[in-house]
């Protein structure tokens, strides 16, 4: 058996098209243009790439895009003052501070300062608490993308056995909550879990988010299971050429056992920015008291 490839390029393009249609409708019906503000501190090359991609895709969806660039040595008070201005700006419905921040800045204080209604990264403790309580919340983008990809394979996740490998605040913990909201039966595994391969072999859905190259081996996978690989790891090429990107799952082994699997690259990573656009439209609708959009 060779697994069906869950193509992030196709799914994210379809999602962005649906977002653009919702933006057009909201503009026409209510005269509102959803706006996303991205704050970049310093000049980390990887962050620069992400910010450019977000700016381009935001504009392509018909939304307003605001970029704020600050030097790496910006005082914490100045960064917090900018966030305060964005919180008060009616043209801004979503605020994203590109992480990680340079040394010397308190990321937790910055996240706490973002208005939860505009927290499109879903990291503010208020949104985390609302998600855990089953209330409407802006959800971290990568876990949201994982659920969308899993539901491309399974119309319903209800009753399925799922394992989430990794317990970060950014991916693992919110993903567990989203799976519970879908009525899946969830195991959360981590570095202290005993006999991780055996736990994986019981799962219909495997979500790998540990940041360890190809840790999940093919023989850990239950035949026919759906595998969502969140990992993006840069590893040296065996022939000494350019580094290659691999996931947390040993793809070459797993694809012959799984029923469906996401590739790396070309999988979950492409969904993250698309889900950021989803969150911005949802935030704009909620702020203006509009019904939840159809994305």
Curated annotation (Swiss-Prot):
InterPro entries listed in its UniProt record: Aminoacid_DH-like_N_sf, NAD(P)-bd_dom_sf, THF_DH/CycHdrlase, THF_DH/CycHdrlase_cat_dom, THF_DH/CycHdrlase_CS, THF_DH/CycHdrlase_NAD-bd_dom
Binding site residues for NADP(+): 166-168, 191, 232
Molecular function via GO: methenyltetrahydrofolate cyclohydrolase activity; methylenetetrahydrofolate dehydrogenase (NADP+) activity
SUPFAM superfamilies, alphabetized: Aminoacid dehydrogenase-like, N-terminal domain, NAD(P)-binding Rossmann-fold domains
Entry keyword Amino-acid biosynthesis: yes
CC per GO annotation: cytosol
Associated pathway: One-carbon metabolism; tetrahydrofolate interconversion
EC number: 1.5.1.5, 3.5.4.9
Catalytic activity: (6R)-5,10-methylene-5,6,7,8-tetrahydrofolate + NADP(+) = (6R)-5,10-methenyltetrahydrofolate + NADPH; (6R)-5,10-methenyltetrahydrofolate + H2O = (6R)-10-formyltetrahydrofolate + H(+)
GO-annotated biological processes: L-histidine biosynthetic process; methionine biosynthetic process; purine nucleotide biosynthetic process; tetrahydrofolate interconversion
Keywords: Amino-acid biosynthesis, Histidine biosynthesis, Hydrolase, Methionine biosynthesis, Multifunctional enzyme, NADP, One-carbon metabolism, Oxidoreductase, Purine biosynthesis
Quaternary structure, from the entry: Homodimer.
Family, similarity comment: Belongs to the tetrahydrofolate dehydrogenase/cyclohydrolase family.
Function comment: Catalyzes the oxidation of 5,10-methylenetetrahydrofolate to 5,10-methenyltetrahydrofolate and then the hydrolysis of 5,10-methenyltetrahydrofolate to 10-formyltetrahydrofolate.
Protein name as catalogued: Bifunctional protein FolD
Organism: Rhodopseudomonas palustris (strain HaA2)
Lineage, uppermost ranks: Bacteria, Pseudomonadati, Pseudomonadota, Alphaproteobacteria, Hyphomicrobiales
């Amino acid at each position: 058996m060779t697994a069906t490839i869950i193509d992030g390029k196709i799914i994210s393009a379809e999602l962005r098209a649906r977002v653009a249609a919702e933006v057009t409708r909201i503009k026409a019906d209510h005269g509102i243009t959803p706006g996303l503000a991205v704050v970049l501190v310093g000049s980390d090359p990887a962050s620069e790439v992400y910010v450019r991609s977000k700016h381009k895709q935001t504009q392509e969806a018909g939304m307003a895009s605001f970029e704020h660039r600050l030097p790496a040595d910006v005082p914490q008070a100045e960064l917090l003052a900018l966030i305060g201005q964005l919180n008060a700006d009616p043209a801004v419905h979503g605020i994203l501070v590109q992480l990680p921040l340079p040394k010397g800045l308190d990321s937790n204080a910055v996240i706490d300062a973002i208005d939860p209604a505009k927290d499109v990264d879903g990291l503010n403790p208020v949104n985390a608490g609302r998600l855990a309580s089953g209330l409407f919340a802006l959800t971290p983008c990568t876990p949201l993308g994982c659920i969308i990809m899993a539901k491309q394979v399974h119309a319903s996740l209800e009753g399925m056995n799922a394992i989430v490998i990794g317990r970060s605040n950014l991916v693992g913990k919110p993903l567990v909550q989203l799976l519970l909201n879908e009525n899946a039966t969830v195991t959360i595994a981590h570095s202290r879990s005993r006999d991780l391969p055996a736990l994986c072999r019981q799962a219909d859905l495997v979500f790998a988010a540990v940041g360890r190259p190809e840790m999940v081996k093919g023989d850990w996978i239950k035949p026919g299971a759906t595998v969502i690989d969140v990992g993006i790891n840069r590893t040296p090429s065996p022939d000494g050429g350019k580094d290659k990107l691999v996931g947390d799952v040993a793809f070459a082994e797993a694809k012959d056992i799984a029923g469906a699997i996401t590739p790396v690259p070309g999988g979950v990573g492409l969904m993250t920015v698309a889900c950021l656009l989803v969150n911005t439209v949802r935030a704009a609708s909620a702020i203006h008291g509009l019904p939840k959009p159809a994305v």
